[in-house]
Amino acid sequence: MWILAASLSALFAGLTAVLAKAGVASTSSTVATALRTVVVAVGAWGMAALTGTASGVTSIDGTSALFLVLSGLATGASWLCYFAALSRGDVSRVAPIDKLSTVLAIILALVLLGEPVSVWGAAGIIAITAGTLLMVEPDELSGLPRALRGGGSWLTFALASALFAALTSILGKV
């Protein structure tokens, strides 16, 4: 069942990128993120109500609540950076960089949570990273130090989006 859920997640994530790019064409990326956040919050609480789990919010302990709030802040930062990157760059360039969050999350899980990574998993990390780098123009990669210093480029925001998305996974797990 998890493979179906993960596949649907990938499908919706791809659709999200295209719809988000169209959405930021005529508004600021911050306003677009705010609107999206409201829609997600209403949908999530609606699902919690439909499944009868909304009352569980009162039984969350303090530590879990803290990490869920931190995870939520990381999610918000990721979304703000992602929409800023999409408003400045092409989906075909922003999305692969954003998906480096998978690599970052696995590395952070290894370092911070002690989760194991198999040889095949390590090979996958290398393959995902190499594939991502192949999808970015060489001149954009060579200009990365300048972009990071100056800020404001699509690449800077896409990298920040990936980092915050990885932190979302780690903080939600703790």
Regions found by a protein language model. Give the residues of each.
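Small-residue-mediated transmembrane helix hinge/kink sites in multi-pass secondary transporters
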Residues: 21, 83, 109-110, 173
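Membrane-interface helix-cap regions at the ends of transmembrane helices
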Residues: 41-61, 133-145, 174
